[in-house]
């Protein structure tokens, strides 16, 4: 999988695109002369909680009350209340994916398409099986669709209290753990990949 590391990441999120757009331009102006923009991607919500495969995304996310334990460094360690972020841009092979019958898509995902119920006899190469959080550890995802009608996919946005959880999931998807590759990766291609440390709000306040 590609490594396209940059020095820093700015992630803006909001329901009003014009406000987000103006904030982004303001940030770019503020850092002019100190840093340059290496890459920019705009995303949006699609059918409430689905990605552009048509499946519900984030079904395995912990509940909001449990999310801090999965995503944030514990107190007493360096970077406490911060998180490791894995950011990847996955370009979908939409025509190939949409040509598959729904039951085939469900076996690739390991879940039903309408209500995201995990299949009892899911294939070992299904996406759910290759990224089993009960095996690798819990993470918190905030994935978003991106792109145009002709070129689109998923921005993977994964937060974890332990970078190894994320790296082991990637190794499993690529088939480096057992030799079994994630079937979903035949229909979506990673274009970028980078890790960032996200400090706590309190840590950022102390920088002022």
Q: Across the structure, where does each feature detected by a protein language model lie?
A:
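Long, histidine/aromatic-enriched segments associated with O2/redox biology
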Residues: 1-208
């Amino acid at each position: 999988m590609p490594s396209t590391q940059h020095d820093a990441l700015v992630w803006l999120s909001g329901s009003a695109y014009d406000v987000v757009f103006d904030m982004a331009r303001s940030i770019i102006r503020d850092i002019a002369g100190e840093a340059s923009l290496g890459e920019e991607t705009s995303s949006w919500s699609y059918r409430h909680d689905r990605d552009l495969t048509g499946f519900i995304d984030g079904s395995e996310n912990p509940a909001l009350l449990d999310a801090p334990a999965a995503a944030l460094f514990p107190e007493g360690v360096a970077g406490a209340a911060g998180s490791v972020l894995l950011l990847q841009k996955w370009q979908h092979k939409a025509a190939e994916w949409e040509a598959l019958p729904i039951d085939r898509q469900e076996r690739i995902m390991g879940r039903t398409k309408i209500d995201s119920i995990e299949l009892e006899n899911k294939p070992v190469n299904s996406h759910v099986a290759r990224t089993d959080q009960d095996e690798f550890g819990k993470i918190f995802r905030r994935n978003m669709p991106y792109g145009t009608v002709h070129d689109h996919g998923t921005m993977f946005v994964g937060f974890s209290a332990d970078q190894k959880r994320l790296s082991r999931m990637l190794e499993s998807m690529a088939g480096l753990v057992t030799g079994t590759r994630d079937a979903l990766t035949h229909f979506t291609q990673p274009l970028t990949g980078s890790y960032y440390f996200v400090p706590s709000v309190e840590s950022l306040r102390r920088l002022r």
